[in-house]
Regions:
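Phosphate/oxyanion-binding loops and surfaces in catalytic or ligand/nucleic-acid-binding neighborhoods
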Residues: 99, 122, 126, 151-155, ...
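P-loop NTPase Walker
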Residues: 1-131, 135, 229, 280, ...
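Coupling/switch/interface segments within P-loop NTPase motor domains and analogous charged loops
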Residues: 138-205
Length: 345
């Protein structure tokens, strides 16, 4: 059984390939530059928006959602939007509430972890969790690991709790349970043993850490066809911000919602718009894979890429220097920021 939901998703209709006269006259689209207008009025399907710093990508994402709803291309319950921070999610909800005459309550807008929490709360039994499961923050997780190590006489100098917490988080970001982790020596085997004990402790105590929110949610979608298909039908329009900062598991989670593997090939459905900037990828130390952007283009057969290159924050001398420096990166997807603000001091 699925939770009651007044929205079953948007009709599988195509948005016009460009804004017509009536759409262009909409107050929603006022003051957008040509690049922003093209991004907001993209046809249904999969697209990549390369959004440089200060290019108004938050405005584009929010206006895109409002435009879809205003023109009847989506219902609130058919939209899922992923932001990088809780602050960005709250800002998006506030903007949409001000822009639209309808309630935005049916939309799923939040961070990966926030959305996974919502999904697991709705399907806690299928996920093997207590209805009232608690979430461990970073400090709570460290305390739990310290307590575990003390109970099992783990040498905390040889296996510092902070390093164990990092190891467990990394395993989960890679989608690995203890049985999936390669062990090449005694230290590796010991860390996997602690990982297993930690999972058992969390399950007994009815708690999950941030990594578990993501991994358990992914496994729920992967292993439960009716639940996965329900949300695939529902979310006809998905928008993901800061795509360059997604990790392996987050991208895999998105694919579960967006399509299925058929004959060894991924077949995506609905409309997924990824917004990101490979020049701003700074979270590799936390598992972020800038390569997810190229994988998205290939696996989702992306036919439309739009570059937001108009910068509204900086002077031209700053942008010229930044463009010159980043041009040495031969693996970037490529864009050049520009401004109308002049050279500055």
């Amino acid at each position: 059984m699925f939770p009651q939901d007044p929205f079953s998703g948007a009709p599988d209709a195509l948005v016009p390939p460009h804004a017509g006269a009536a759409s262009a006259a909409s107050p929603l689209l006022a003051n957008l530059n040509d690049e922003q207008l093209a991004a907001v009025t993209l046809p249904a399907g999969h697209a990549l928006i390369l959004a440089g710093a200060g290019s108004g990508k938050t405005r584009v994402l929010t206006t895109r959602i409002a435009w879809l709803l205003q023109n009847g291309y989506a219902t609130p319950g058919g939209i899922l939007a992923v932001t990088f921070t809780n602050k960005a999610a709250k800002e998006m909800v506030a903007r949409l509430s001000a822009m639209l005459p309808v309630s935005v309550r049916g939309m799923w807008i939040g961070t990966f972890h926030g959305l996974c929490n919502r999904l697991l709360r709705a399907h806690h039994k299928a996920a093997g969790l207590a209805q009232s499961f608690q979430i461990l923050d970073t400090q709570d997780q460290l305390s739990a690991i310290k307590r575990l190590c003390k109970q099992h006489n783990v040498d905390d100098e040889r296996f510092p709790p902070k390093q164990l917490a990092y190891f467990i988080a990394h395993c989960k970001e890679e989608g690995m349970r203890p049985g999936d982790v390669p062990t090449h020596d005694s230290d590796a085997r010991k860390k996997v043993e602690i990982y297993q004990l930690y999972e058992e402790q969390c399950q007994r105590e009815g708690v999950v850490d941030f990594g578990e929110l993501m991994l358990r949610s992914y496994e729920l979608l992967r292993d439960n066809d009716p639940i996965r298909e329900h949300y695939q039908r529902r979310f006809q329009h998905m928008l993901v911000d800061e795509f360059q900062d997604t990790n392996k598991l987050q991208y895999a989670w998105l694919k579960q919602l967006a399509g299925n593997e058929v004959g060894g090939r991924f077949e995506a459905r609905g409309s997924v718009i990824a917004v990101g900037d490979d020049d701003q990828s700074i979270y590799a130390f936390r598992g972020a894979r800038v390569g997810n952007m190229a994988d998205f283009v290939r696996e989702f057969d992306v036919q439309r890429q739009i570059k937001l290159e108009q910068n509204y924050r900086s002077y031209s001398n700053i942008l010229d220097s930044a463009n010159a420096l980043i041009s040495h990166n031969s693996r970037r997807l490529g864009k050049n920021l520009r401004t109308t603000q002049g050279a500055g001091e």
